[in-house]
Swiss-Prot record:
This is Large ribosomal subunit protein uL6. It comes from the Bacteria. InterPro entries: Ribosomal_uL6-like, Ribosomal_uL6-like_a/b-dom_sf, Ribosomal_uL6_a/b-dom, Ribosomal_uL6_bac-type, Ribosomal_uL6_CS. Part of the 50S ribosomal subunit.
Length: 177
């Protein structure tokens, strides 16, 4: 039985919830999100908390209720605080520059890489070797960060490439003669 689904979701002040059947819509200071819950999960609001429960007590339905609770909790955190992912560029001549809705990357290719920023995401470049991806939806923020990293993933010999700020690159030793 899911222990995650039993825990209620606390709604911070400034976050409004609209429940319409299986659709949960959240509106907060950072933005708004909505999600269609699984048919086997029901949601109820009691004061400033949300409670998710399976429709009938099957084990797989409890697991689904736990998953839905985690997704709704991420939505609450997103509309109240937002999510951010930090990337670092390691390598000689590797640079990033945010211009409007485009991120221009110089990653050692014969051409610069222009990445169009999706809707609902803001990208900042505090320095030429740092990229901050910010947004309301945790999944989209992670996806955008992964797509930027995929242009030049860190290589194991010198560690050059685009890496997450907290990522440890496992190094290999160069071949000896």
């Amino acid at each position: 039985m899911s222990r995650v689904a039993k825990k209620p979701i606390a709604l911070p002040s400034g976050v409004n919830v609209t429940i319409n059947g299986n659709n949960v819509a959240l509106k907060g200071p950072k933005g708004q999100l909505s999600y269609d819950l699984h048919a086997d999960v029901e949601v109820s609001q009691e004061g400033n908390t949300l409670q998710l429960a399976p429709r009938n007590g099957d084990a797989s339905k409890y697991a689904m209720a736990g998953t839905m609770r985690a997704l709704v909790n991420n939505m609450v955190v997103g509309v109240s605080q937002g999510f951010e992912r930090k990337l670092e560029l390691v390598g000689v001549g590797y640079r990033a520059q945010a211009q409007g809705k485009t991120l221009n990357l110089t990653l050692g290719f014969s051409h610069p890489v222009a990445y169009p920023v999706p809707e609902g995401i803001t990208i900042e470049t505090p320095s030429q070797t740092e990229i901050l991806v910010k947004g309301v939806d945790k999944q989209v923020v992670g996806q955008v960060a992964a797509e930027i990293r995929a242009f030049r993933p860190p290589e194991p010999y010198k560690g050059k490439g685009v890496k997450y700020a907290n990522e440890q690159i496992i190094r290999k030793e160069a071949k000896k003669k």
